[in-house]
């Protein structure tokens, strides 16, 4: 019988140089503190000796385009490549120092996809989509020079309306937990993104955050109050800059009813950063 043995969620732009340029010295200090906390989370993940690591993140119109934006997409196959761009955005330049190819856990990815389709989840699949900073910056920050286990990347449409609902993302996380429980694998799961910010897709609000809303989300996760999170609407997530919290909702469904333990929270003019862990037996 399989088991989810580790859960973590964190911001996914993890580059001191980027925050130095965007926010000055305080930006470098805070992202460095966040990265230190994430590396310590990695110590605990390594102790679990997981067979696979599921990573739930959003695409930044790198793997997909307006020709097709899947609500939820499972990356399947034997390996995945990191995104390579000639003129990468500043936050994607961090990829230049990371490995080019990563192993995938083919069996687990296929099970999540196939059993999901059999149980009412209209999932997309990809054999070729590359992964960007949203997937690889957290994984490499958490594990450093240590071996990276086979991954199962899952893309959630966080930005392009209509997005999946918070409740549906939570339900998909519950589906992941059921698939893992029926498997022979021990599994970690990461969700990435946030907290509140407005990316370049929303130019008029770049630089804004919503600390009050972020702290409310954290309180609900720490106390295990998932009902208010299930009722979050697309309008609420949009107004507060919390689009990427949909990734976290998938994780919450997978690890429920466990309560969150905050490892780092830091306010910046451009984004509020967090690193959160769920202690699972």
Listing of model-derived features with the role each one plays in the protein:
Residues 1-50, 66-171, 182, 202-281:
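Flexible, D/E/H-enriched segments
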Residues 12, 60, 196:
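Short, glycine/serine-rich, charged loops/turns that create anion-binding
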Residues 51-57, 154, 185-195:
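Beta-strand elements within well-structured catalytic alpha/beta cores of enzymes
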Residues 55-60, 179:
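Short HxH-centered metal-ligating active-site micro-motif
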Residues 63:
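Active-site environment of divalent metal-dependent phosphoester hydrolases
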Residues 174:
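Phosphate-rich cofactor/ligand-interacting catalytic cores and adjacent structured alpha/beta frameworks
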Residues 178-185:
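Nuclease catalytic cores that cleave nucleic-acid phosphodiester bonds
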Residues 195-199, 203:
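A structural signal for small-residue-enriched, beta-sheet-centric alpha/beta enzyme cores
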């Amino acid at each position: 019988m399989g088991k989810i043995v580790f859960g973590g969620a964190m911001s996914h732009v993890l580059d001191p140089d980027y925050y130095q340029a965007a926010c000055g010295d305080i930006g470098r200090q805070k992202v460095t503190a966040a990265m230190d906390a994430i590396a310590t989370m990695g110590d605990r993940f390594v102790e679990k000796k997981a067979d696979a690591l599921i990573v739930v993140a959003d695409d930044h119109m790198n793997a997909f385009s307006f020709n097709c934006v899947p609500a939820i997409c499972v990356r399947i196959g034997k390996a995945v490549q990191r995104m390579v761009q000639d003129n990468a955005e500043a936050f994607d330049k961090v990829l230049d120092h990371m490995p080019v190819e990563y192993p995938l856990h083919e069996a687990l990815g296929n099970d999540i996809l196939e059993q999901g389709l059999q149980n009412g989840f209209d999932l997309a699949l990809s054999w070729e989509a590359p992964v960007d900073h949203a997937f690889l910056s957290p994984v490499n920050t958490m594990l450093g020079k240590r071996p990276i286990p086979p991954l199962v990347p899952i893309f959630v449409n966080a930005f392009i309306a209509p997005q999946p609902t918070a409740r549906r993302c939570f339900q998909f996380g519950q589906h992941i937990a059921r698939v893992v429980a029926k498997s022979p694998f021990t599994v970690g799961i990461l969700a990435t993104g946030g907290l509140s910010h407005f990316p370049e897709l929303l130019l008029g609000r770049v630089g804004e955050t919503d600390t009050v809303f972020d702290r409310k989300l954290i309180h609900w996760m720490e106390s295990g109050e998932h009902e208010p999170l299930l009722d979050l609407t697309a309008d609420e997530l949009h107004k507060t800059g919390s689009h990427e919290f949909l990734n976290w909702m998938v994780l919450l469904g997978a690890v429920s009813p466990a309560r969150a333990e905050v490892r780092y929270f830091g306010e910046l003019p451009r984004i509020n950063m967090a690193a959160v862990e769920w202690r699972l037996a």
